[in-house]
């Protein structure tokens, strides 16, 4: 385990000029302060100058142990592992430890586009497994997604980057993996991995469960055996506020015993029906779906609103006084029955507003407002002669649908709040009300006008 704080390691990096790779590599090789492997690994990640551009972040060893507890049981004499984005090997080393005594030999192909990371990974492997003669690792300095692979593996395991990509590179990958809507590079890592191995264990952004650009990747794996989904929440990466999950897939067999769902933040473990998680009625996967959710869903009419959100209104163009009131999420109390003025109300001049998309709603009072980033949903009628900033979404009823005050108050009820948390998979970060989330703001069938 890591024994030194990040602050202490940062001080070491500065004192020993470890942002220089040559010095960093020598420091790790010599280990003059007798640091633990985990400390050295964290230090190497912190000193990685390419971390942001390659979306490579430190995977906490404690979290990797949680991952390893769900690794598949594989019955062979030689285990063949592929790590598509190995970094300095934090996951790889613990996976090898897990399987070390269970096979005659272990063979690994490991990829990374950062040659320095591969060199450090090799040092750590040599330090930690010097007594393991039947371990063979092939270090490949190349892009896993474009590298031609002929062989098959028993296990693909890793933590791919999560960044969005564009341009020719993205279009080539979309064509190669028959996924014309994917924007996030992790989708292509998953698409390629499931064609290479019996078992796939990949860490993914939690918004994989929700976002529309992952919908084709979700479709590709919904009929594999999803043995387990571990929800790490925000615990996986130190210093990076992103929620993650880990998918454990058996690509060759059917799921007959259910999908294990583990929530690290909530400390719960469930066995869910895979077909209910991956159902097609709702626009996203639902890993925490339960009887209460299904009961309320059976009473509701969904997809009644379209949503609009404008992020063009920034603090630069707002004033403490002015022509037009700009409603923020703070102006909509938890009670969900009114809009209130607050001490730090803000306003915008007509001339500035006229250039923005939200201006079209200025005179309207037939649309509705909802705070955007919250677990406490509420929906209120928009007054005339005001607009909203990006913290508030505007709901517009679809044609031939009406709504009552009782329907609106339902959105602020504890019953709908619990329902909505499950709809959002208990996320804490990805809570924007987008074209997926708006689906769940429905109303009970007996209230439909």
Positions of PLM-derived features:
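C-terminal substrate-recognition regions of SAM-dependent nucleic acid methyltransferases
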Residues: 233-370, 375-376, 383-384, 397-449
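Signature of N6-adenine DNA methyltransferases within the class I
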Residues: 52-53, 57-66, 85-95, 105, ...
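Short amphipathic alpha-helical segments
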Residues: 106, 391-393, 437
């Amino acid at each position: 385990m890591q024994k030194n704080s990040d602050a202490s390691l940062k001080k070491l990096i500065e004192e020993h000029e470890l942002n220089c790779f040559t010095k960093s590599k020598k420091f790790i090789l010599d280990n003059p302060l007798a640091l633990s492997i985990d400390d050295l690994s964290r230090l190497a990640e912190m000193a990685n100058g390419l971390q942001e551009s390659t979306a490579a972040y430190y995977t906490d060893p404690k979290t990797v142990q949680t991952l390893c507890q769900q690794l598949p049981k594989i019955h062979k004499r030689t285990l063949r592992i592929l790590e598509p984005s190995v970094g300095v090997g934090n996951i790889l080393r613990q996976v090898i430890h897990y399987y070390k005594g269970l096979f005659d030999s272990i063979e690994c192909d490991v990829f990374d586009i950062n040659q320095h990371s591969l060199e450090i990974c090799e040092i750590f492997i040599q330090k930690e497994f010097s007594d393991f003669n039947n371990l063979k690792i092939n270090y490949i300095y190349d892009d896993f997604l474009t590298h031609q692979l002929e062989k098959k593996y028993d296990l693909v395991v890793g933590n791919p980057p999560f960044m969005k990509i564009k341009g020719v590179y993205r279009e080539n990958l979309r064509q190669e993996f028959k996924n014309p809507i994917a924007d996030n590079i992790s989708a292509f890592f998953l698409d390629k991995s499931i064609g290479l191995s019996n078992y796939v264990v990949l860490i993914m952004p939690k918004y994989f469960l929700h976002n529309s650009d992952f919908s084709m990747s979700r479709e590709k794996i919904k009929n594999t055996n999803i043995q387990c989904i571990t929800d790490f929440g925000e615990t996986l990466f130190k210093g990076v506020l992103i929620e993650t999950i880990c998918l454990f897939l058996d690509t060759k067999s059917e799921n007959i015993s259910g999908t294990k769902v583990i929530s690290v933040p909530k400390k719960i473990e469930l066995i869910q029906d895979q077909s209910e998680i991956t159902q097609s009625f709702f626009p996203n996967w639902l890993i925490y779906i339960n009887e209460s959710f299904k009961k309320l869903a059976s009473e509701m009419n969904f997809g009644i609103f379209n949503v609009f959100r404008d992020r063009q209104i920034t603090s630069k163009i707002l004033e403490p006084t002015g022509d037009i009131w700009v409603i923020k999420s703070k102006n909509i109390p938890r009670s969900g029955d009114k809009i209130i003025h607050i001490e730090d109300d803000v306003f915008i001049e007509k001339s500035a507003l006229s250039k923005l998309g939200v201006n079209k709603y200025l005179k309207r009072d037939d649309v509705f407002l909802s705070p955007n980033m919250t677990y406490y949903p509420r929906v209120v009628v928009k007054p005339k002669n005001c607009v909203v900033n990006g913290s508030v979404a505007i709901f517009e009823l679809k044609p031939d649908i009406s709504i009552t005050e009782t329907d609106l108050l339902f959105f602020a009820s504890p019953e709908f709040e619990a329902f909505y948390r499950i709809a959002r998979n208990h996320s804490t970060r990805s809570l924007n009300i987008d074209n997926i989330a708006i689906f769940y703001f429905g109303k009970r069938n007996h209230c439909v006008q």
